[in-house]
Design a protein with these regions (language model features):
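Carbohydrate-recognition beta-sandwich/jelly-roll modules
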Residues: 1-217
Length: 217
């Protein structure tokens, strides 16, 4: 469903792990968007692993078991939070963490992995707002939400979700997603990069950077 402060749209669609590209639109009256939500029945085997992509890939996002807990920053000592502001790097201040087993969330894409078989669910368009995936193992439900609350809608068709579903090996599902996005590698040559941040943080000057660059030769 999706809604503005002037009215609501409810609809259904048939979706499977092999559906490929799926576009869900909602006819809404003009007004301020309140939400856009889709709920899918989605079972997870006990031996499967779940990956939820962290907010802008900054939030901690390990693979989780079916009944694992997704942690925020509650285990980080308060003095470290105050000194380094670790709680500002991710979504910890605007997405609730239940702390319950089997409940997790992430942004833009997620996958369920059973051995070498992946079920990928991913967004094809984040322009209308971030796509937030949430999974509840106990309810066997995958919730998809568009971060669009507060946006003015002029009325008519709203692109609630533009999604991609694929099942196969890791290379198969991600290559298919990138192809659907029109994302092509700029080169097939292996590339390397350098950043001073994780070695020196803000303590940099010309001499320290030159030392690092000399070490890369």
């Amino acid at each position: 469903y999706a809604a503005t402060d002037s009215g609501r749209f409810d609809g259904t669609a048939v979706i499977t792990p092999r559906s490929g590209a799926v576009c869900l639109r909602a006819e809404l009256p003009a007004g301020v968007l309140q939400n856009a939500v889709a709920a899918l029945p989605w079972t997870m085997a006990r031996e499967e692993k779940l990956f939820m992509n962290g907010y802008q890939t900054w939030t901690a996002c390990p693979e989780l078991g079916k009944w694992d807990r997704q942690h925020g920053v509650e285990r980080v000592p308060k003095f470290l939070l105050e000194k380094y502001s670790f709680d500002r790097y991710g979504d910890y201040h605007f997405v609730p963490y239940s702390g319950k087993r089997g409940q997790s969330h992430g942004f833009s894409y997620c996958y369920f992995r059973r051995g070498k078989t992946y079920r990928l669910l991913a967004s094809l368009d984040e322009a209308p707002g971030y796509t937030i995936f949430s999974y509840d193992s106990r309810a066997a439900q995958l919730r998809i939400e568009r971060d669009c609350a507060g946006v003015q809608h002029t009325g008519g068709s709203f692109p609630a979700f533009s999604l991609f579903f694929a099942e196969g090996t890791e290379d198969e599902v991600f290559d298919a997603w990138f192809a659907a996005l029109g994302c092509r590698p700029r080169t097939t040559r292996r590339l390397a990069g350098y950043s001073s941040w994780y070695n020196r943080y803000q303590n940099i000057d010309e001499a320290s950077i030159q030392e690092d660059l000399n070490g890369c030769k």
